[in-house]
Amino acid sequence: MSEKYVVTWDMLQIHARQLAQRLLPVEQWTGIIAVSRGGLVPAALLARELGIRHVDTVCISSYDHDHQRDLKILKKAEGDGEGFIVVDDLVDTGGTAKVIREMYPKAHFVTIFAKPEGRPLVDDFVVDIPQNTWIEQPWDMGVMFVPPVCDKK
């Protein structure tokens, strides 16, 4: 990855609210399935914005910190996804998205961020990201002091 895209908590909440607007009316949804772990925070934000209380998870392991590896399904939500919004933070190459589509063919699959290779696999997303960009999510970062530019020697 040659570029980094840093996401702040404020940006994430703004993007989630934009996505929630597109998912109205809420009456069409039975619940949300969050793709663990990346989709947990966006799913919580969407659940709040849409007033949805039925939230389940599908647990798929595909990354070891910053390296992609083989997919491993750890836990699956029941059903074919009918009436459910499946939420992940991003769609990258589409590996996880393909598995999600097979497990939940009737679900509405959304992400906050989408890269070109995976974009066709989601029903909706908010932000286009170049394929060669690494996304730094706010839950993966700590807050630290950075000295002013004029203090650097």
Swiss-Prot record:
Signal peptide: none annotated. Mg(2+) binds at residue 89. Pfam families: Pribosyltran. GMP binds at residues 69, 92-96, 134-135. Its cofactor is Mg(2+). Belongs to the purine/pyrimidine phosphoribosyltransferase family. XGPT subfamily. This is Xanthine-guanine phosphoribosyltransferase. The lineage of its organism: Bacteria, Pseudomonadati, Pseudomonadota, Gammaproteobacteria, Enterobacterales.
